[in-house]
Amino acid sequence: DKEHRQLLVADLTYYYGTVLFVSHDRFFLNQLAEKIWEVSDGHVKEYLGNYDAYCRQKELEQQTRYNVYHQYQKEKKKLQESYTKKQAQAQKSSHVSKKQKQKQIKPSRLAGSKQKDTVQKALQKQAKAINARIDRLPDVAQAKQERKIIFPTNNQFSLYNPYPIRIENLTFAYENRTILNQVNVQIPLNEKIALCGKNGAGKSTFLQQIEACHPAIYFSPKVRLGTYHQLDYRLKNDEPLLTYLLKRTNYSEKIVRSLLYRLGFQQENLQTKISSLSGGEAIKITLAQLFIEPNNIILLDEPTNFLDLETIQALEEFISAYQGTVIFTSHDETFVEKVATRTIYLENGKIIDK
């Protein structure tokens, strides 16, 4: 939890030896890292500084790749246009009408005819040289561009109630221990609510009571819940992943593809069977499914666990773009800062709203 992470950061900050660590926690990386080793495509690349410095360097690299690719496309287009023009000129110089062919070439015109042949050959030679330059252009990979996620307006989000969930005097005990004690809170429409607190404070229990429709919790009639639990990613299905998701949504294939692309799935991955996915890939599909199903309130219990940084950032975009209400637990401070519009703390079984 937050308190123990800060203690760990303090301990490691004053440690005099070398620390080599693996983490997807951006707060932790920013506090401790002096160098970052990025492992990608079988290679390791070193960046100096903490995570924020790493991000700035990555953005610069991305912009450089974009500029190089843009210049490559510009040069290639210019050469192709020049090649087409020279080809047309060569063809025009070689064109002789039927009437001209039937005419007997006089000695006085012979020199002019030879000159035309010379011009034609020169133009063809120039065109060939331009084509060779095109072939010699180095292959430049297209810079990856992020696609902004936009969820269209949908009637499923019209709940006609500014507080679709009201909790009144919710009490819950387990094994003679009171976990939630007369909790009272209203969940506003379309808010992104972070549920924070120490380990064991009752955050997951709180979400479970909402999911179970505890008698002390009142729902607007049109509420439809979607839930994600820790380790909730075991999908048993032999359908291709694109087909699997399209069967579970009213959104267009374009939107589903854009979500999959943002989660790192390329065109060649879309026919992969659900049952063949790795654990990390299955988590991505489970989360994507939540945001495209006809839900209007989503409960997420520690969704960033087991996710790499790129997927965490994609999830941040999904939550921010989502038009419904999201209630989530997370110990990832950066994640909370990025997406939460409201933060609720659980302490000693009580709600502290901040």
Language-model segments: residues:
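ABC ATP-binding cassette signature C-motif
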Residues: 1-70, 157-354
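Coupling and communication elements adjacent to P-loop NTPase active sites across diverse families
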Residues: 60-175
